[in-house]
UniProtKB/Swiss-Prot annotation:
Record lineage: Eukaryota, Metazoa, Chordata, Craniata, Vertebrata
Species, as recorded: Bos taurus
Any Pfam family: Ank
Role description: May be a substrate-recognition component of a SCF-like ECS (Elongin-Cullin-SOCS-box protein) E3 ubiquitin-protein ligase complex which mediates the ubiquitination and subsequent proteasomal degradation of target proteins.
UniProt record similarity statement: Belongs to the ankyrin SOCS box (ASB) family.
UniProt keywords, alphabetically: ANK repeat, Repeat, Ubl conjugation pathway
Cystine crosslinks: none
A single GO BP: protein ubiquitination
Domain notes per entry: The SOCS box domain mediates the interaction with the Elongin BC complex, an adapter module in different E3 ubiquitin-protein ligase complexes.
ANK repeats: 75-104, 110-139, 143-172, 176-205, 209-238, 242-271, 275-304, 307-336, 349-378, 379-408, 416-444
Signal peptide: none
Protein name: Ankyrin repeat and SOCS box protein 15
Amino acid sequence: MDANDDPDEDHLTSYDVQLSIQESIEAGKTVFYPERFVPLSDQNRKLVEAIQQGHILELQEYVKYKYALDEADEKGWFPLHEAVVQPIQQILEVVLDASYKTLWEFKTSDGETPLTLAVKAGLVENVRTLLEKGVWPNTKNDKGETPLLLAIKRGSYDMVSALLKHNTSLDQPCVKRWSAMHEAAKQGHKDIIALLLNNGGNVHLKDGFGVTPLGVAAEYGHCDVLEHLIHKGGDVLALADDGASVLFEAAGGGNPDCISLLLEYGGSGNIPNRAGHLPIHRAAYEGHYLALKYLIPVTSKHAIQKSGLTPIHSAADGQNAQCLELLIENGFDVNSLLADHISESYDDERKTALYFAVCNNDILCTEILLAAGADPNLDPLNCLLVAVRANNHEIVRLLLAHGANVNCYFMHVNDTRFPSAIQYALNDEVMLRLLLNNGYQVEMCFECMHGDIFGNSFVWSEIEEEVLPGWTSCVIKDNPFCEFITVPWMKHLVGSVIRVLIDYMDYIPLCAKLKSALEVQREWPEIRQILENPCSLKHLCRLKIRRLMGLQRLCQPTLMEKLSLPPTIQRYILFKEYDLYGQELNLP
């Protein structure tokens, strides 16, 4: 047989010719612009009305006016577009036969062709009619969607089958190289997946992000489709462009059956993506409890350590308390720190899982972590400062009850003589007293270089190394409290704040700068009266007892209960009369 008579080659040549014709039509087709709209003829209006009402005899009369078929309304719809979205097949046939073939590919102003409109409308017979008449099956709408993709979105096996029988391109990419196989995997249509594969579908085809249909099925939790694709040769160990494995995608979807299936067929929980995240991190962040139960035993400690963060961090970041509890039950350390390269990617250089919970204002996760032994003092920016600035009284209470350093400084931007927390609580007496009741060094707010109201100079006290490790006193002395609170935009607060502070002191060394600012405040008469009179012996004893006990014992209720003191005295020592937040909640 002569090579020129090869039927396969003839078929390919015919296909190439058809594709060339289609490209010519695409290049030369009329684009409809609403601003070019001209009034429709009476014949066009009557023709469209006949289509919409299903009057075949009237339609046959009006299609004789060819110009009426070539007129579009303000939406860019020609009579053919109207015909494809109505259910009577004979009407479509009449309009299609009467229309010029160039109109078969014309798009509406929304970018839809007659075929994509028919598919979207779910009219299988209309789709078949268009295809049998020779409408090109591969023209995309302006969103980049092919008729095949739209048919799969509708879940119509019959439409997909009809399109495949008329030489639709199965692997034709849409936006971001998303293919029919990917869409079928996303929608979970096992029958359509089987049909596509039987017609030459590629199980290894990757989208614009390097994800295979297997990865898509795993992400969307379609276990039956996933298993079918695996049996058809899908690669369980395939990686996307960002390094994400199929198991990583399944962890994001959260279907435990998909994860179990992938593990059964050789999937590994120890393969990180390019960011270093493992499937266990993804499941913990997304809050997929059952998926996490599968992943914990198959993920190695070495892989987690190498990643630079723990699933505890991920669960706290994702605000997933149940997953957090599961991880703690399985022995994960709540005080594990982020690796330096990850920590440095955050502006605040956070380290702990607790910091994530506090930043998220997540009271439940904060409580779980603290109950499990989380140390609130491990981050460069102390968790307490974050909670105070966020005005979250409950998290501040929890942190202080579990040993947060109320006298901490933000070590990276430390330019105050006084501990940092108070500067975020000046507008909130409840928060201010919460800090003061728990041992804030209020005397530090009255140390400055201005001298007292009698003209005497103050002496700078030395800062203990354990309080401010690695910092010299010259850094701390830059900005005393009196300078801080008397700036023009905060000067109005000086009276109310100083009135609260003196409740926690024995001797008040008021400097000349503070005095001049206080004299114009409405609280000044009361403050002056307190300054002119000695403190009560009871109050002085309270302050002495607190100094002897130390912050650790004061802030832990269990230790306080061990003291052989009457409850009334215990409450007095703890400044319970000033515990405004506790009074709001009726706390003991």
